[in-house]
């Protein structure tokens, strides 16, 4: 059994890791941490875990944690992760980090969007953990940077088109809508019920969202040249889910049927990417609670644009599920272990 620690277990991504790994036949959770809730039973913080976990949340002490775990998930805010990840690596532990701290390759880019990086050499060593694009590198990595939720939905939606150079990269527009859990579990006025319910708003408008450099970094690698995109996220009054609608101008004549054939071939054999039939488009309700990314496609012949729609659960394929998928790859387990749950519907 692989002994696993979850550092930062009292947030939404932490409890989703616990839920998913409870059904994993090769994993034993040996340690969970939370600075705010140390000393409390995890089932007290999350009643959904009653009678399934007897763990008590601990303070973050890397050496003590490493003594009891072979593998570490860090589900901490940015900056907090980079303070502890190097210690775990020095102690010989493999890590999947769910924060933004190791996703960007360029330390100057990280500083521009966040703050100065404390260990920039690790940016070059970490592997961006999108399994459908980086499976072989993930398998041999000691540190995997789990992708962000918006980037996962946009990158998977665009990868085949950019790889085959079927769209003009300069024309990409991504319009994404997310449930409120994407903002995390800490109290914020903007996320209160009365602020969110019956409303629908854009934020991070005008190229201000921190996921933009991550999206552009990975799309540029696919395109083989540097690109910039127009990306606008929106907050919708639902618990979870991301729906991204992506627009681009094709480089030549292409039909919806041809696009579907391309996407089916590109993602053939991928357990968690589902390409929908022509004329069918994703809904967040069809991936809720699952590790699937559903993708639908169309060509708008009137405007001459390609339209791609992708849907994921921001807490699963956009966070904890993808982290478990990466852990499976890193440890030679079947990729779908612990991730076979179907979507919750209705």
From Swiss-Prot:
Catalytic activity: N-acetyl-L-glutamate 5-semialdehyde + phosphate + NADP(+) = N-acetyl-L-glutamyl 5-phosphate + NADPH + H(+)
Family membership: Belongs to the NAGSA dehydrogenase family. Type 1 subfamily.
Class of the enzyme per the UniProt entry, highest EC level: oxidoreductase
GO molecular function: N-acetyl-gamma-glutamyl-phosphate reductase activity; NAD binding; NADP+ binding
InterPro entries the UniProt entry points to: AGPR_AS, AGPR_type-1, NAD(P)-bd_dom_sf, NAGSA_dehydrogenase, Semialdehyde_DH_NAD-bd
Tagged with keyword Ribosomal protein: no
CDD domains xrefs: AGPR_1_C, AGPR_1_N
PANTHER family hit by this protein: N-ACETYL-GAMMA-GLUTAMYL-PHOSPHATE REDUCTASE, CHLOROPLASTIC-RELATED, N-ACETYL-GAMMA-GLUTAMYL-PHOSPHATE REDUCTASE, CHLOROPLASTIC-RELATED-RELATED
Chain's role: Catalyzes the NADPH-dependent reduction of N-acetyl-5-glutamyl phosphate to yield N-acetyl-L-glutamate 5-semialdehyde.
Gene Ontology terms describing biological process: L-arginine biosynthetic process
Principal subcellular localisation of the protein: cytoplasm
Pathway: Amino-acid biosynthesis; L-arginine biosynthesis; N(2)-acetyl-L-ornithine from L-glutamate: step 3/4
Gene Ontology CC annotations of this record: cytoplasm
Keywords: Amino-acid biosynthesis, Arginine biosynthesis, Cytoplasm, NADP, Oxidoreductase
Stated name of the protein: N-acetyl-gamma-glutamyl-phosphate reductase
